[in-house]
C-alpha cells in the first residue's frame, strides 16, 4: 500500500533530494495523448504522480484544471478509459507512487469500496478526496485501510493544532500541505510562511509533507524543500503546458520534459 511512498521518501532522503510530483488530469486532451503525457512526466524525472479523473464538478480547481477536465470530458473519456491508462502506466513503471486527487461525488457514484478496489487493481497507491476533510473521512478511511490504499489528507496553512494532530494521526502515504487557501493554480503565487506548519507536522509524526497549490517555478520548489517539505506538487503549471500546445504534440512533450527536469533539479539540496 504505502510502501511505494515509504521507499521513495527513504531513497530521496538518502540522496538529500526532495520529491517533484506533477499533476495532470487523466484523458487530457484525449486518451492516446494522455498516456504519452504521463509517460513523458515519469521518464523526465517525476518522483511520483498525482492524477485527476475528469469530472464535471471540481470545486477547488482553478480555471486551468477546470479546462483540463472539460477537454478530457469533451474528448469522450470515461472512468474505464482512465483505469486503462493507470493500468498501462503501472505496468510500465512498477515502482513510482501513483496518487489520485478526486472529489467525493465521483467516489460515491461508483460505490466507495468498489471504486477503491478498482483503483488498487489499476495500481493506484493513494487517494486524496479534496472535499472531504480528515474529521469527516471515516467511511473513506475505513475502506482505504481494508482495501490497502493510502488515504491522503490536506493540511491547510491556517489549520489549528488539533486539525494538524488529527491529519498526522489519520493520514498515510504523504500529507498534502497547502501553501495558501483558495483554489489551485499559478494565478496566485504560493506564499511560503509554512515552516511553522511543517514543524508541527514533524512534531506529530505526520506522513511526509508535500507542498502544493501555486507551485510553478523551480525557486518555489527550492523554498518548499528548504522550509522542510519532503517535496512539491505542481498542477496548474503542468496542465498549462498541455493547454498552450494543444495543436503541437511534439512541442508539448518537449516542454513538459524540460519543465519536469528543471523542477526536479530544484529538489536537489
Curated annotation (Swiss-Prot):
MF (Gene Ontology): tryptophan synthase activity
One GO term describing the cellular component: cytosol
Reactions performed catalytically: (1S,2R)-1-C-(indol-3-yl)glycerol 3-phosphate + L-serine = D-glyceraldehyde 3-phosphate + L-tryptophan + H2O
Record EC number: 4.2.1.20
Uppermost EC category: lyase
Active site: 50, 61
InterPro entries for this protein: Aldolase_TIM, RibuloseP-bd_barrel, Trp_synthase_suA
Keywords: Amino-acid biosynthesis, Aromatic amino acid biosynthesis, Lyase, Tryptophan biosynthesis
Listed pathway(s): Amino-acid biosynthesis; L-tryptophan biosynthesis; L-tryptophan from chorismate: step 5/5
SUPFAM superfamilies the record matches: Ribulose-phoshate binding barrel
Role of this protein: The alpha subunit is responsible for the aldol cleavage of indoleglycerol phosphate to indole and glyceraldehyde 3-phosphate.
NCBIfam families assigned: trpA (TIGR00262)
Family statement drawn from the similarity comment of this UniProt entry: Belongs to the TrpA family.
Subunit-structure text: Tetramer of two alpha and two beta chains.
PANTHER family: TRYPTOPHAN SYNTHASE ALPHA CHAIN, CHLOROPLASTIC, TRYPTOPHAN SYNTHASE, ALPHA CHAIN
HAMAP family documented for this protein: Trp_synth_alpha
Protein name listed in UniProt: Tryptophan synthase alpha chain
Organism: Francisella tularensis subsp. holarctica (strain LVS)
